[in-house]
A protein has these predicted regions:
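Alpha-helical scaffold segments
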Residues: 1-100
Length: 100
C-alpha cells in the first residue's frame, strides 16, 4: 500500500482506513489526494497544501496559517479560499508576481 501511494498519491482512495504514514506518503506525492482522506490531521493538511496550494479546497474551515501556506505554494490558490484576509490576498499577489 505504501509503495502504491508513493508512486501515485490518488491510490489512497482504494485503501480503507489508511495509516498516518500512508496518508503522509499520499499527500507528499499529490497534495490534492487529501480529498480521499477522512478527517486528516492538521499535520497532513499542512503537508498537502505545501505540496499543492489547491489542496486547501478540500480542507474544512482552514486556519489563517493553512491559507497562508497554500498561497505561498501557489498564489492562484486564493481562488478556492473563501473570504481570505487582506494578508492572504497580499501574499497571494506577491507570489503570483514572483512567478513572472
Amino acid at each position: 500500500q505504501l509503495a502504491a501511494v508513493k508512486q501515485h498519491g490518488y491510490e489512497i482512495k482504494f485503501i480503507k482506513n489508511p495509516s498516518e504514514a500512508i496518508q503522509l506518503a499520499a499527500v507528499k506525492r499529490n497534495g490534492t489526494s487529501i480529498k480521499f482522506i477522512k478527517n486528516p490531521s492538521e499535520a497532513i493538511q499542512l503537508v498537502a497544501v505545501k505540496q499543492d496550494g489547491y489542496a486547501i479546497q478540500y480542507i474544512k474551515n482552514p486556519s489563517e496559517a493553512m491559507q497562508l501556506a497554500a498561497v505561498k505554494q501557489d498564489g492562484y490558490a486564493i481562488r478556492v479560499i473563501s473570504n481570505p484576509s487582506e494578508e492572504i490576498k497580499l501574499v497571494a499577489v506577491k507570489q503570483i508576481k514572483s512567478m513572472r
